[in-house]
Design a protein with these regions (language model features):
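Conserved glycine-rich beta-strand-loop-beta hairpin in the small C-terminal domain of fold type I
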Residues: 241-246
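Hydrophobic alpha-helical segments, chiefly the membrane-spanning helices
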Residues: 327-333
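Oxyanion-binding "anion nests"
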Residues: 197-234
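Conserved small/polar residues in nucleotide/adenosyl-binding loops
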Residues: 316-321
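N-terminal Rossmann-like NAD(P) cofactor-binding subdomain of oxidoreductases
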Residues: 1-193, 229, 262, 276-304, ...
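Helix N-cap motif at beta-to-alpha junctions
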Residues: 251-254
């Protein structure tokens, strides 16, 4: 017997991708309902070879439904997720609302799949921030071999992380560079994104870090190990899809780069492409269309006794099928 599945936010990029992946993976769903806000009521969305007509999230009765995939913002999640959970539907939430709630598991399947068993406290499972998700997939297998002491990460995050408006702004500004009659001032981003990089994602905190950077610290501790020290610098780059990260890892004891490479080759959700030659690494272009976290440039850090440097890339399309959808297929729930 299959599940009855709800996708809330079905007309957005993430919601549509959820429906695509549910169909592609042949998830055992007997029935799928597509929900949207009142202004999108009646919109048609694709689910495999079927067409679903969206229903009103505000009036939907979650009773008798098994799983609700929430691809709406924190405000809507706060209003509707408790309603769904109280009706007995397991909510799997993409927003940041429940990530730091001690009674809600924060799950990356390749890293802490067992944590999903804690969903019953509130009937809610949270999904981490995109930049955290790809990093912990790389960190966890290494941490299991030799405990990690400290992580320094710099991100190169595509405009898809800012949604369709961010992608449109990059496209429009790029065209405007070559057509001076077009005046495309920044709207979604605080500064020009075309042919530029912006060291600012989300709002600024009192200590000078941004909320995106704070998320990476807090979520890594919750998912992997509270004892790991993490410092992050998150940067928006003029790439349409695909997030990348430069990660420096300091271990408690020595870990050889060859052993680290072997560990990562065997790790779930990881694809190692690491040749010390021109083109022997992965960029966001190559990562597009695949659900793996690609890792390259694995090498010792000669400035500390127990350090490793690496580069990782992950497809991300607001968010990627892997982050936003695959981690929402709760086989244990």
């Amino acid at each position: 017997m299959g599940y009855r599945v709800v996708v809330a936010g079905a007309t957005g990029n993430v919601g549509r991708e959820m429906l695509n992946i549910l169909a592609e993976r042949e998830f055992p769903a007997d029935e799928v309902a597509a929900l949207a806000s009142r202004r999108s009521l009646g919109t048609e969305v694709s689910y495999g070879d079927k067409t679903l007509v969206t229903k009103d999230l505000d009036t939907f009765d979650f009773s008798g439904w098994d799983i609700a995939l929430f691809a709406v913002g924190s405000e809507a999640t706060q209003k509707y997720a408790p309603k769904a959970a109280a009706a007995g539907c397991v909510v799997i939430d993409n927003s940041s609302l429940y990530r730091y709630d001690p009674d809600v598991p924060l799950v990356v399947p390749e890293v802490n799949a067992d944590a999903v068993l804690g969903y019953s406290k509130k009937n809610i499972i949270a999904n981490p921030n995109c930049s955290t998700a790809q990093m912990v997939v790389a960190l966890k297998p290494l941490h299991d071999r030799v405990p990690i002491k400290r992580v320094v990460v710099s991100t190169y995050q595509s405009v898809s992380g800012a949604g369709k408006q961010g992608m449109d702004e990059l496209w429009d500004q790029t065209k405007a560079i070559y057509n001076p009659t077009d005046d495309k001032r920044p709207e979604k981003f605080t500064k020009q994104i075309a042919f530029n990089v912006i060291p600012h994602i989300d709002k600024f905190m009192d200590d000078g870090s941004t909320k995106e950077e704070w998320k990476m610290v807090a979520e890594t501790k919750k998912i992997v190990d509270t004892r790991i020290k993490v410092t992050a610098t998150c940067v928006r780059v003029p790439v349409f899809v695909g997030h990348s990260e430069s990660i420096n890892i300091e271990f408690e004891d020595f870990l050889d780069e060859d052993e680290a490479r072997d560990i990562l080759r065997e790790a779930p959700g990881v694809m190692v492409i690491d040749k010390r030659e021109d083109g022997g690494y992965v960029t966001p272009v190559e990562a597009a269309g695949d659900y793996a976290t690609f890792i390259s440039r694995i090498r010792q850090d000669s400035t500390i006794d127990n350090g490793i440097n690496l580069w990782c890339c992950l497809l991300y399309t607001s968010p990627s099928p892997r982050d936003a959808t695959l981690s929402r297929m709760p086989s244990s729930a």
